[in-house]
A protein has these predicted regions:
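Generic detector of contiguous secondary-structure segments
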Residues: 1-17, 119-120, 187, 196, ...
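N-terminal entry segment of metal-dependent catalytic domains or homologous docking segments
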Residues: 1-69
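N-terminal capping/linker segments that flank leucine-rich repeat
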Residues: 67-70, 75-175, 189, 194, ...
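Leucine-rich repeat
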Residues: 149, 170-174, 192-196, 217-223, ...
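Canonical leucine-rich repeat
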Residues: 165-168, 187-190, 209-212, 217, ...
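Concave beta-strand-loop units of leucine-rich repeat
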Residues: 154-163, 173, 179-183, 195, ...
Length: 826
């Protein structure tokens, strides 16, 4: 940056300096510009100004240039004297130079002003928004300048529980903005973000797309990608004017009419999944459409009209129609341009129509009723095929599909897999839950990087593999799942040096010595076995994730050198001594529940821990945790704590990152000290001995609160917890629930087995999807008729008549209502 100053040059009548150019400040002035003579009297000084640029040399000080430092003129030489009136051109030059210098001075001042303005600190109007921005940009408490904001092109503010985003107007350079999973209905602040190309506004409970919303969206001339999923929208008529959109996501809404979309002819990708759409005639003009997701819309029957329309979409390459209760797909045989087709989770048994789709690269038929796959042999271009969970026993038709790279066959009745031996391009293969005993055919699949032989799930008979020597040839294998496979000898794997992930859980093994050679492992799952000794793990220094849960381990000293571990599950063992863990400073997640632990001092050095589960032990002193400032989740439930001391609270308050705390099952009666843990978002106090919950009124950031199984009768303190999403108050002594009428964000509420008779306070809780009122004294359920979002409602063991229950069922057709009624129909 240059700072401009001025130096005054005066006529003194002295002899010029012996050089052709005269230096003023740090600028050289040519002889003909500096040769200013005396006027007619030879005395009057006429200064003019020359801009000097700071930072260009040692002399760039911007000081006035005096006659002592700069001399111009030629004293006594009358022949060179001039009068301004006699030399107008020379005078004009002088004036022009002076004007230029003045302009440079003004520009310099403006640059300084603009520089200061551009560095102005940004002041936010909404604290929640500022906090969310700082978290997204990882700025903590640093000064945030306007210049910083203008450099930001992508911003993720998802899940910050925001409602006011007016401050977003300053982020004028944004091209990508994610405001999903908030409570934002007003987006007027986006109007000037004309560089925005992608906007994710999903999961905001919008309900209605109004004219104001569309006006803002239309102003975003460059907007190409819009996500409005999970918003309970039913009417999308206003979207028809957003003609520049190329990608539109409308999944998980209540849409049935999509006629407004016919004008958005630039659309290339459209997601309509999980709605109630049967008529797709509006799509016929969307000739640029390449991807269409029409899954989970309960279509039932694919009729000729559907197929005629889909055929007209000449550029359509990807079609998703999963979970639609479809049984007949004969009409789909004409969609010969398709490259990817998903028909999973339907009721399809006959797939002969697919034989014409020879351009298919990807086909998903999982979760159907298919037994005959002969027609698939025609689909020579297939690279990905999913046939999981059907009724297939013969896979001979697959042997010619040599382009396959991914093949999923789990959950069928396959016993012979010789056809797979020809598929040498396979990289991913799943064969779990079949009737396979011989896997020798796999030895030729040397390109395999991922193999799944997991078993004993979903109640199926399962494989019976004893010999896995064929796997010894698969030297590129990186991931192997043997969970529940009844394979106890894995010595054949000793040469698989690329193996980084092994799941050997649920196998009833006790000896793991064969693991000593697999030193490349990064993820190892040995859960639900009969392991007591783990010395073989001592050399597994590359391990990052280790699951040893549900075994017979009491000595964990072999783990002390596994310093790369980030996730460790030792739950449900017989461990009491934790000293081997004290050097595992990379640990982020540690599960120690259901052991014999009393002393946790060894955990004091694990400063990277974010999640710690100590439940079902005998830990009463948590002072060792005081330095674990990254801890966000602590489960200290069922440890016979009894009393929450000031020391405990002091430790917990020091854990400034902690958001989730579980103190359930601890026989606690006094929770007054917990009122200071104002950062908590989730608190579980179920099954204690609590009667006074007044201290909880301060925890206004709570989203989840569990108080079931206590002695609570007064819940007035809960009226302040307006951010709650989930509340459990079952098995208490509650009669009055008026305090709940302010908790309009509640989605899940459990009040079973209390003494509640009047439920009128619930009438405004329109966000509820789960409500449990069983085991109370309720006789009138009229207050529930407006809760149109209810999906699960439990009313057992109340004083309801059959008529009242039936009337409620008519009012809430979408809800599954579990109830019984008294014999009196009055």
């Amino acid at each position: 940056m240059f700072k401009f100053t001025c130096a005054a040059l005066t006529k003194t009548g002295k002899k010029p300096v012996n050089r052709d150019n005269y230096m003023v400040g740090n600028l050289y002035v040519p002889q003909d510009h500096a040769d200013l003579r005396n006027n007619a009297q030879g005395k009057t000084e006429q200064p003019f100004f020359v801009a000097a640029a700071d930072g260009m040399g040692d002399e760039a000080s911007g000081e006035k240039v005096s006659a002592e430092t700069t001399e111009v003129g030629n004293k006594g030489n009358g022949s060179n004297d001039f009068n301004d009136n006699e030399n107008p051109k020379r005078y004009q030059k002088k004036v022009i130079i002076a004007v230029i210098c003045a302009l440079l001075l003004v520009i310099g001042i403006l640059v300084c002003i603009l520089s200061k303005t551009s560095k102005k600190q940004l002041n936010f109007h909404d604290a929640a928004f500022e906090k969310a921005v700082r978290e997204a940009l990882n700025l903590a408490d640093d000064e945030m300048l306007t210049t910083d904001i203008l450099r930001i092109k992508e911003l993720d503010l998802s899940g910050k529980k925001l409602s006011d985003i007016s401050d977003i107007a300053s982020f004028k350079k944004l091209t990508t903005l994610n405001i999903s999973s908030n409570e934002i209905s007003d987006i007027s602040a986006l109007e000037n973000l004309t560089n925005l190309t992608e906007l994710d506004w999903s999961s905001n409970k919008i309900g209605v797309i109004n004219d104001e919303h569309v006006s803002v969206l239309r102003s975003l001339k460059n907007l190409q990608v819009l996500n409005l999923g999970y918003n309970n929208i039913s009417d999308i008529s206003a979207l028809g004017s957003l003609k520049n959109l190329q990608v539109l996501n409308l999944d998980f809404n209540n849409i049935s009419d999509i006629s407004a979309l016919e004008n958005i002819t630039n659309l290339q990708t459209l997601n309509l999944s999980s709605n109630n759409i049967n008529d797709i005639s509006a799509l016929k003009k969307l000739t640029n459409l390449t991807e269409l997701d029409w899954s989970d819309n309960k279509i039932g029957v694919i009729n000729d009209e559907h197929v005629s329309l889909l055929r007209s979409l000449k550029n359509l390459q990807t079609l998703v129609m999963s979970s639609n209760e479809i049984s007949n797909i004969s009409a789909l045989g004409d969609l010969t341009n398709l490259r990817s087709l998903d028909l999973s989770e339907n009721s399809i048994s006959d797939i002969r129509a697919l034989g014409n789709l020879t351009n298919l690269r990807s086909l998903d038929l999982s979760g159907n009723k298919i037994s005959d796959i002969t027609t698939l042999k025609k689909l020579m271009s297939l690279q990905t095929l999913d046939l999981c969970y059907n009724n297939i026993s013969d896979i001979g038709a697959l042997k010619k599909l040599t382009n396959l790279q991914t093949l999923h066959l789990s959950g069928n009745s396959i016993s012979r897999i010789f056809a797979i031996g020809n598929l040498t391009n396979l990289q991913t293969l799943s064969l779990g839950n079949n009737n396979i005993s011989d896997i020798s055919a796999l030895k030729t699949l040397t390109n395999l990087t991922e193999l799944d032989l997991a078993d004993a799930m979903y109640g199926l008979t399962g494989n019976n593999i004893n010999d896995i020597s064929a796997l010894g040839n698969l030297t590129n294998l990186q991931t192997l799942n043997l969970s529940g496979s009844k394979i106890s000898d894995i010595s054949a794997l000793k040469n698989l040096t690329e193996l980084t992930k092994l799941d050997w859980g649920y196998n009833n093994i006790s000896d793991i010595s064969t693991l000593e050679n697999l030193t490349s492992l990064q993820t190892l799952e040995l859960n639900h076995n009969s392991i007591s000794g783990i010395r073989a793990l001592g050399n597994q220094t590359n391990l990052q994730t280790l699951d040893l849960s549900d075994n017979e381990i009491n000595n964990i000293s072999a783990l002390e050198n596994l310093t790369s571990l980030q996730t460790l599950d030792l739950s449900d063992n017989k461990i009491s001594d934790l000293r081997a863990l004290e050097n595992l400073t990379s640990l982020q997640t540690l599960d120690l529940n259901f052991n014999n632990i009393i002393d946790i001092n060894a955990l004091g050095n694990l400063t990277s821990l974010q999640t710690l589960d100590l439940s079902f032990n005998n830990v009463s002193d948590i002072s060792a945790l005081k330095n674990l400032t990254k801890l966000t989740k602590l489960n200290w439930g069922y440890n016979k704590v009894g009393i929450i001391t000031d020391r405990d609270v002091s430790v917990l308050r020091g854990l400034t990152s902690m958001q989730e705390l579980d103190l359930s099952g601890n026989n606690i009666s006094d929770i007054s000290a917990l009122g200071n843990l104002t950062n908590l978002r989730s608190l579980d106090l179920n099954y204690n001995n609590i009667s006074d919950i007044s201290a909880l009124g301060k925890l206004t950031n709570l989203r989840s609160l569990g108080l079931s199984g206590n002695n609570i009768s007064n819940i007035s303190a809960l009226g302040n917890l307006t951010n709650l999403w989930s509340l459990s108050l079952s098995e208490n002594s509650i009669i009055y629930i008026n305090a709940l009428n302010k908790l309009t964000d509640l989605q899940s509420l459990r009040l079973c087995f209390n003494n509640i008779g009047d439920i009128s306070a619930l009438t405004n809780l329109t966000n509820l999807w789960l409500l449990d009122l069983s085991g109370n004294d309720i006789s009138d359920v009229g207050a529930l008729e407006n809760l149109s979002g209810l999906l699960l409602l439990y009313l057992d063991n109340n004083n309801l008549t059959k008529q009242k229950v039936e009337e409620l069922c008519l009012k809430l057709p979408q809800a599954q209502i579990q109830s019984e009624w008294v014999d009196n129909d009055d």
